Amino acid sequence: MTQKKSVLVIGFEPTLLDFSSPEFAAFPGLDAAKVLQALKADEARLKDLGCDVELCLIDLGETAETVVRDRLRRKQFDCILIGAGVRTIPSHFILFERLINLLHAHAPQARLCFNTNPGDTAEAVQRWL
């Protein structure tokens, strides 16, 4: 990457999630502390690669769209990642769909990418920058 790229990483505030739920069976051993640790590590990695990174941790839907919309109004992003917890957990599918449409309307210039777990965020972003 030759110039500093701006990246928005959208994911659930991990302390709001019930990792013991059957919906999280695909992520054995995951908990809020591990998610936050992985996000912070990937944030640091992306910064080391020259990216300007912002974490946008959202709730389970009550204010999520407003929080993301406010971020998009403040700044233009080159790449936006929506985390696997938002994207892959069936009970969050409608919120994921609403966020995609929000990004389409308010950040049409941004590349969209998706991680498969909290530890591969940097790789997902690098695919599109």
Language model regions located:
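Ser/Thr/Gly-rich flexible loops in soluble cytosolic domains mediating phosphotransfer, phosphorylation
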Residues: A38-L39, L95-L129
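A generic structural motif
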Residues: A44-V53
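N-terminal, charge-rich interaction modules
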Residues: M1-A25
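Short beta->alpha junction loops
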Residues: E54-T63, N115-N117
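Short catalytic helix/loop segments, enriched in acidic residues and glycine
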Residues: A25-A44
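Short, well-ordered secondary-structure micro-motifs
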Residues: F19-S21, T66-V67, F93, V125
